[in-house]
Regions:
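Hydrophobic, regular-secondary-structure patches
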Residues: 1-44, 51, 87, 132-133, ...
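Residue-level detector of beta-strand face positions
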Residues: 33, 96-100, 183
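Mid-to-C-terminal secondary-structure elements
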Residues: 51-65, 76-176
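Non-transmembrane, solvent-exposed regions of membrane trafficking/translocation machinery
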Residues: 67-69
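Peri-transmembrane interface segments
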Residues: 158-159, 175-209
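Intracellular coupling helices
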Residues: 209, 218-229
């Protein structure tokens, strides 16, 4: 059987893992032909919550990202990638303009850029509650994106992963011996490697007397995200 997440799973994780949890966001995937005036193209839709900006390190170029008010009131607001704005609006300011997609009209409230490359900048973010409403008031979600508190470190992150997996298996009635069912991609291993690399690099840089350079390197360890699906 297919394991599905819904809004109640989000609340359950928040209620039971406050010790570890920094932020959490659902993610629902969709695709749509997005149109503005005479221009249109097919884009990837990601329906998320405001904390998704933190998890993805999305950089706002214009306007703003989603707010809790957008989620609560299921607003038809859209945050579009830099290349979406370039495709549809060219030199026109997209903020406050309306685009059509999936048979509905959406107000553009922000434009973002992403270091992940062109593919990430051809994405449209919308409130997850708005997409759920469009999809016949379903509360299903595809993935849950979580970040853990930096102070728990690598050991705490691994502990969090193990406890979260067991919690979700119990919640979804999956056998404890079932290696599948729940998939968690934990980048804590990347964090550990980055910290070890940064520590080694710090020793080298300190030895040659230019320790100030390390400040720009340690930033790579700021990847602390689980993907649960």
């Amino acid at each position: 059987r297919r394991i599905e997440f819904d809004n109640s799973d989000l609340k359950a994780i928040i209620d039971n893992f406050d010790k570890y949890l920094e932020s959490i966001s659902p993610r629902i995937y969709d695709y749509a032909d997005i149109k503005y005036k005479h221009k249109s193209n097919n884009y990837s839709i990601r329906a998320v919550s405001p904390s998704h900006q933190y998890n993805e390190m999305t950089i706002m170029m214009q306007g703003r990202f989603l707010h809790e008010d957008d989620i609560t009131n299921k607003k038809r607001h859209a945050v579009i990638g830099r290349l979406v704005a370039l495709d549809l609006f060219e030199d026109e300011n997209p903020i406050g303009k309306y685009i059509d997609g999936s048979g509905h009209t959406w107000k553009v409230i922000g434009v973002f850029q992403d270091d992940g490359g062109d593919r990430e900048e051809r994405i449209v973010y919308i409130p997850y509650t708005s997409l759920q409403k469009i999809k016949k008031n379903t509360d299903k979600i595809d993935e849950i994106i979580l970040s853990y508190k930096p102070e728990i470190g690598y050991v705490g992150a691994v502990e969090f992963e193990q406890k979260l997996k067991q919690f979700l298996k119990n919640r979804k009635a999956i056998s404890p011996t079932d290696g599948g069912g729940i998939y968690i991609r934990n980048v804590a291993d990347n964090l550990k490697q980055n910290q070890e690399f940064a520590s080694l690099l710090q020793l080298i840089i300190t030895f040659i007397g230019i320790g100030t350079l390390i400040a720009g390197i340690i930033g790579i360890s700021n990847i602390m995200v689980f993907v649960v699906k």
